[in-house]
C-alpha cells in the first residue's frame, strides 16, 4: 500500500522505500522500487508521476476566474435590477398616489391640518380644503369637531359637516358661500316683454339670470316724488331653446339691461348638510349670515341653530342678514332646519319679528321643508321671488317682503307666536293649506297685505282646510289685512281675490275686511266659526256654520253679501251685536237661530231672504227694501222702518 514519505517533500539527499509518495512542485510521485540517494525525481526508472495538480489547479483557477466573471456580471445585473426595482417602486408609488387621489371620494378639514378643537384658528386649513375640493370636484366630509367662524370659504362641491360652528360677533359674513361654477355679468340692449318666447340675448339661453335696469318712471309709494331711482328688476329662467319660463315681473321695457349672476340651469347639484351653529345674539340686533347660496340646484339640509339668547327687542334686519340666505338662483331646497332657542318661548316671544332664520331674494322655484322654528326664531323672509313653497314647518312668521310671483304655497304647517303670513305686490297664486294657526302676538294680522311701494298684492289667495284657534283674541284684530293698491303709470290697480275652502275659525277677530272703495272679493265655502265683516267686502259664503254674525257696524253701501245653505247662530257667550248690512244682502236656504237682527240706514239697501228657516222672532230694521220668499218662520220677525216690505210663499198667519 502506498504511503506518504516522511517528510513528504521530495529531496535527492534522501532514499525512499518502494511505494512511498512524495510531493514535488505541486505534483505527487510514487516510488516504483527502492530509490538510492542522488536519484532525480524525473528518473522514470524509480519514480511514477501520480498526480499533476498544477494543471488541475490551473483548470480550477480558470474555471473559478470564469465563474468570478460571471458573478461580477451577475452582481452588476443585480445592481441594475435593484436600480430598476427602485425605479419601479418609485413609479408604483407615483401610481399609488395617483390612484389614491383618483379613488379619494372626499377630503376632510383634518387632511389640511385643522385641529377642530374650538380653540385653534383653523381658518387657513378650512379655506385650503375648500380650494382643493373646488379644484378637484370632490366633496368635503367632516365628522366631529368644533370651529370658530373666523373665515370665509367659497363652496362649489357638496359638504357634509357634522360638527359645531361658533358664530362670533365679528365673524365674516357670509362664513360659507355656495357659488356657481362660471357665473357671468354682462349687459345687453333690447326689449324684455311679458309674453316673449325667446330670450332677449343668446347668452341667456339655458341660464338663470337676474335682469335689471334703471326706470325713473317707477317711483312709487313713499319714494314717489323724491327723485330716487328705482330699479326695474326681473328674475328669469330660460330653457335650452330660449323659451321664457317665467314672465317679467314688471312692465315691458326697452333699453340697456344688466344681467348679473348668469349661470346654467343645469349646473352640477351641490349639497350642504349637517352643521350645528351656536351664536350668542345679545350683542347684535340680527342673526349673522352663516351660509349664502348663489348656485342653482343646491340642497341645504340638516342644519341646527342654537342661539344662546333672544335678539334684542329692537332687532331689525333684512332677510339678507338671515342665518341662511338664498340669492339670485333657481331650484334650491332648504330642509330639516331647526332653530332651537332655549331662552325664549315661541308662544309669546315677539322680539325676533325681523331677525330671519332664512331669507330668499330674487329666486325661482325654491322650497323650504321641515323647518322647526322653536323659541321665537321661525322667521322666513323673501324678496322678488317666483314660485316659493313652505311645507311641514313650524314658524312664527313668513314674511314675503317684496314682489311675489308664480305660486306661493304654505302647506302642512303651523303658524304660532306672531303667526303672520305676508303677501307683497305681485300676481302670485298664494295657497295656504292644512295650516294650524295659533296667534300669540295680538297686534299682528294673520295674513297681511304689504304695500311697501304703494302697490299691493294683486293675485289670488286660497285658504284650504285650515284652523285658527285664538281663545283670547281681540275683536278689533283682523284675520286678513287687505290694503288698497294704487295705479301708477302702466302699473294698474288689480284687485286680488280671496278663496276660502275649509276654515275652522275659533276667534273673534275680524274675518272679512276690505278697505273702503276696494270691494275685495271673498269666496267662502266650508267655514265654521265666528263670522265678522268690516269695510266694503263682496262676500259669497256657502255650506258654512256661523257661530256669531257680527259686522261691527262698519259696512259701506258698496257691500254685497250672498249667504247660501248655511246655519247662522249666535253663541250665548258672544256679545249681543246687530248686523249692519248696507248694500246688497241675500240670505238663501239657511237656518237662522237667534241671529237675524239687521240694522241699516241706507235707503238703497236691498235685503232678500229666501228659503230660510227662522227659529226665533228677531227685529229686522232697515230703510231700504226687504223681501222674504219661501221661508219657514216659527216666530214672526219684526220688520220696522223699511220703506218696502214684501213676503212671498209664506202662510197668512205668518204674514
How would you name each of these model-derived features?
Residues 1-76, 82-83:
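Tryptophan-rich substrate-binding surfaces of secreted polymer-degrading and adhesive proteins
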Residues 35-56, 227-284:
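Small/polar beta-strand repeat architecture
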Residues 153, 167-182, 279-286, 290, ...:
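Extracellular beta-rich repeat passengers
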Residues 39-44, 113-129, 284-291:
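Short, polar loop/linker segments at the starts of domains and inter-domain junctions
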Residues 123, 127-184, 192, 213-232, ...:
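N-terminal extracellular ligand-recognition/capping segment immediately after the signal peptide
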Residues 21-36, 196-253:
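Ser/Thr/Gly-rich low-complexity blocks that favor extended beta-strand/coil architectures
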Residues 161, 185-216, 265-281, 292-308, ...:
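Parallel beta-helix/beta-solenoid
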Residues 97, 109-143, 193-203:
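Acidic Gly/Asp/Thr-rich repetitive segments characteristic of extracellular carbohydrate-active
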Amino acid at each position: 500500500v502506498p504511503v506518504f514519505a516522511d517528510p513528504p517533500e521530495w529531496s535527492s539527499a534522501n532514499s525512499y522505500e518502494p511505494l512511498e509518495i512524495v510531493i514535488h512542485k505541486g505534483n505527487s510521485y510514487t516510488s516504483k522500487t527502492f530509490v538510492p540517494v542522488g536519484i532525480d525525481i524525473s528518473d522514470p526508472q524509480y519514480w511514477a508521476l501520480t498526480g499533476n495538480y498544477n494543471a488541475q489547479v490551473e483548470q480550477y483557477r480558470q474555471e473559478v476566474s470564469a465563474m468570478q466573471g460571471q458573478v461580477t456580471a451577475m452582481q452588476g445585473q443585480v445592481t441594475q435590477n435593484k436600480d430598476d426595482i427602485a425605479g419601479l417602486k418609485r413609479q408604483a408609488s407615483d401610481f399609488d398616489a395617483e390612484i389614491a387621489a383618483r379613488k379619494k371620494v372626499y377630503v376632510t378639514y383634518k387632511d389640511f391640518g385643522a385641529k377642530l378643537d374650538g380653540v385653534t384658528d383653523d381658518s387657513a386649513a378650512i379655506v385650503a380644503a375648500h380650494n382643493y375640493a373646488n379644484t378637484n370636484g370632490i366633496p368635503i366630509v367632516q365628522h366631529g369637531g368644533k370651529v370658530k367662524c373666523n373665515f370665509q370659504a367659497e363652496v362649489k362641491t357638496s359638504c357634509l359637516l357634522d360638527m359645531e360652528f361658533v358664530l362670533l360677533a365679528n365673524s365674516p359674513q357670509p362664513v360659507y358661500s355656495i357659488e356657481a361654477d362660471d357665473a357671468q355679468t354682462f349687459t345687453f340692449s333690447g326689449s324684455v316683454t311679458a309674453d316673449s318666447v325667446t330670450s332677449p340675448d343668446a347668452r341667456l339661453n339655458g341660464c338663470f339670470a337676474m335682469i335689471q335696469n334703471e326706470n325713473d318712471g317707477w317711483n312709487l309709494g313713499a319714494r314717489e316724488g323724491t327723485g330716487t331711482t328705482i330699479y326695474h328688476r326681473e328674475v328669469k329662467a330660460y330653457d335650452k331653446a330660449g323659451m321664457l319660463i317665467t314672465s317679467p315681473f314688471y312692465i315691458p321695457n326697452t333699453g340697456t339691461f344688466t344681467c348679473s349672476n348668469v349661470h346654467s340651469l343645469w349646473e352640477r347639484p351641490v349639497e350642504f348638510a349637517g352643521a350645528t351653529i351656536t351664536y350668542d345674539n345679545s350683542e347684535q340686533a340680527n342673526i349673522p349670515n352663516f351660509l349664502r347660496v348663489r348656485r342653482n340646484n343646491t340642497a341645504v339640509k340638516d342644519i341646527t341653530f342654537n342661539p344662546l339668547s333672544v335678539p334684542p327687542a329692537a332687532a331689525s334686519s333684512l332677510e339678507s342678514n338671515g342665518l341662511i340666505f338664498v340669492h339670485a338662483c333657481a331650484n334650491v331646497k332648504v330642509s330639516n332646519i331647526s332653530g332651537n332657542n332655549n331662552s325664549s318661548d315661541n308662544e309669546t316671544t315677539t322680539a325676533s319679528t325681523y331677525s330671519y332664520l332664512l331669507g330668499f331674494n330674487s329666486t325661482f322655484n325654491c322650497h323650504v321643508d321641515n323647518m322647526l322654528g322653536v323659541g321665537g326664531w321661525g322667521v322666513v323672509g323673501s324678496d322678488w321671488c317666483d314660485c316659493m313653497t313652505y311645507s311641514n314647518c313650524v314658524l312664527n312668521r313668513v314674511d314675503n317682503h317684496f314682489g311675489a310671483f308664480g305660486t306661493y304655497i304654505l302647506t302642512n304647517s303651523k303658524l304660532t307666536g306672531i303667526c303672520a303670513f305676508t303677501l307683497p305686490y305681485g300676481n302670485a297664486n298664494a295657497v295656504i293649506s292644512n295650516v294650524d294657526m295659533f296667534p300669540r302676538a295680538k297686534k299682528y294680522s294673520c295674513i297681511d297685505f304689504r304695500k311697501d311701494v304703494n302697490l299691493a298684492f294683486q293675485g289670488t289667495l286660497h285658504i284650504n282646510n285650515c284652523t285658527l284657534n285664538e281663545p283670547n283674541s281681540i275683536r278689533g284684530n283682523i284675520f286678513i289685512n287687505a290694503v288698497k293698491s294704487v295705479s301708477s303709470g302702466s302699473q294698474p290697480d288689480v284687485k286680488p281675490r280671496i278663496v276660502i275652502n275649509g276654515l275652522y275659525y275659533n276667534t273673534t277677530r275680524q274675518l272679512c275686511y276690505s278697505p273702503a272703495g276696494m270691494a275685495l272679493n271673498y269666496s267662502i265655502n266650508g267655514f265654521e266659526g265666528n263670522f265678522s265683516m268690516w269695510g266694503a267686502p263682496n262676500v259669497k259664503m256657502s255650506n258654512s256654520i256661523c257661530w256669531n254674525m257680527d259686522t261691527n257696524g262698519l259696512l259701506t253701501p258698496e257691500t254685497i253679501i250672498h249667504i247660501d245653505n248655511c246655519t247662522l247662530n249666535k253663541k250665548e257667550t258672544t256679545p249681543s251685536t246687530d248686523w249692519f248690512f248696507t248694500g246688497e244682502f241675500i240670505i238663501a236656504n239657511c237656518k237662522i237661530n237667534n241671529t237675524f237682527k239687521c240694522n241699516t240706514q241706507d235707503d238703497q239697501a236691498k235685503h232678500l231672504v229666501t228659503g230660510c228657516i227662522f227659529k226665533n222672532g228677531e227685529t229686522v230694521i232697515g230703510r231700504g227694501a226687504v223681501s222674504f220668499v219661501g221661508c219657514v218662520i216659527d216666530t214672526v220677525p219684526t220688520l220696522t222702518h223699511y220703506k218696502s216690505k214684501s213676503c212671498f210663499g209664506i202662510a197668512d198667519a205668518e204674514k
